[in-house]
Structures are given as C-alpha cells and as structure tokens.
Swiss-Prot record:
Taxonomic source organism: Aquifex aeolicus (strain VF5)
Name of this protein: Large ribosomal subunit protein uL10
Coiled-coil residue spans: none
One cellular component term from this protein's GO annotations in UniProt: cytosolic large ribosomal subunit
Subunit: Part of the ribosomal stalk of the 50S ribosomal subunit. The N-terminus interacts with L11 and the large rRNA to form the base of the stalk. The C-terminus forms an elongated spine to which L12 dimers bind in a sequential fashion forming a multimeric L10(L12)X complex.
InterPro entries: Ribosomal_uL10 (IPR001790), Ribosomal_uL10-like_sf (IPR043141), Ribosomal_uL10_bac (IPR022973), Ribosomal_uL10_bac_type (IPR047865), Ribosomal_uL10_CS_bac (IPR002363)
The entry's keywords: Ribonucleoprotein, Ribosomal protein, RNA-binding, rRNA-binding
A Pfam family annotated for this UniProt entry: Ribosomal_L10
Family: Belongs to the universal ribosomal protein uL10 family.
Length: 199
C-alpha cells in the first residue's frame, strides 16, 4: 500500500480552494457588470464607513422600494468589474470602504434618497462621502451627483407635465361651462328689459 503524502494532499486542497475563491470572485465581478448593464450605465460609489448595520439595512430597503440596489464590495473587484468603463481613469474611487448604488428605474429618486440619508447621518461631513460614479456610462463627479439629487424625480416631472397638459382642458371646460351661464344671464336681462318696457 502506498504511503499517504500529507504535503501533496495539502497542496491539492489549497489549489482546489484557490480555484473556488477565484471562481467566486469572478462571479462577483460578473454580477457587478450585470447590475451596471441593468441600470443602463448608472452607479454611484460612496464611503459607508461609520454607518451602522441597521441604518444601512434600512437604507437598502428604501432604495429597493425605489427599484435600486446598494452593494458593498471589495475595491479590487469593483475596479475589475468597471475597468472597461471610464472609471478605469478614476481609480481613486476604489479606495477605502466602498458601496455601490445602482438604479434600475429612476436614478434621481435613488440619488435623492442616498443624499438625504448621508445628510441625516453625517450632517455637514456628508459631502465627502460621495466618491463619484457613472450616468449613462459617463463619469460623474461627486458635485454632479449632488446636482442630480436636486433634480425633480420622474414622478414629480410626470405630475408637472400632467398639470401643464391638463391646464388647457380645464380652461376649455370652464369656458364651455361659462357660455350657457352667460346666455342665461343675457336672456334674463332681455326678459327684464321687456318687462320694464311693457309697464
């Protein structure tokens, strides 16, 4: 019977574990790429250091309700996933604790929610938390992220548009309603004139 080689066995185990780790990392990189594609090239990176687990979980739920997602990941994997975008020129984003915010419907709504949360959590120091990101696969600075958060959301824009579209219809309805009322008043005035003239 052959003697058991502990070192060879240990090496095979390390090699198998290493392959599993590499596969897992590649799966994460692919999932980040899929999220970016699903979000039509929208992602914002922010520093989550100092945010307790419970508030971060609540933020994640709020973002999920707005059809978005927050992912906490390793900078090397984020960089690998986004290295084929303009973010490859902005490696400074991938330094320190990093979370990614994806929006699958309304980027403005999820950005507003993130900025609101950061303001509540960090008061005056919130601005340094935003690292930048992508909008339609184009790089956006932290300042542009703040400007994005100040835009009206999709729902607000739809409400304003409906108001603009409904104004002429409402005016027409009021005009049409006023015509019979004015006619009645004119007829009443004629009737009063005749009754005065007849006496």
């Amino acid at each position: 019977m052959a003697e058991f080689d502990k070192e060879a066995y240990a090496e095979r185990e390390r090699s198998a574990a290493s392959r599993k780790t590499l596969l897992k990392k590649q799966e994460l990189v692919n999932s980040y790429k899929e999220r970016l594609q699903k979000s039509n090239g929208f992602v914002i990176f922010f520093n989550f250091q100092g945010i307790d687990a419970y508030p971060l979980t609540l933020l994640r739920l709020d973002i999920k309700d707005l059809k978005g997602e927050i992912v906490v990941g390793k900078n090397t994997l984020f960089y690998r996933a986004f290295s084929d975008t303009v973010l490859s020129d902005h490696r400074d984003i991938f330094v320190g604790p990093t979370a990614a915010l994806f929006a699958y419907e309304d980027p403005v709504a999820v950005t507003k929610k993130l900025v609101e949360f950061l303001k509540e959590t960090f008061d005056k120091e919130w601005e340094g938390r935003i690292k930048g990101g992508l909008l339609d696969y184009k790089y956006i600075t932290p300042e542009q992220v703040k400007e994005l958060a100040e835009l009206p959301s999709k729902e607000e824009l739809i409400a304003k548009l409906l108001g603009v579209l409904m104004a002429p219809v409402t005016q027409l309805a009021m005009t049409l309603k006023a015509v019979p009322q004015k006619l009645v008043l004119v007829l009443k005035a004629i009737e009063e004139e005749k009754s005065k003239g007849g006496q």
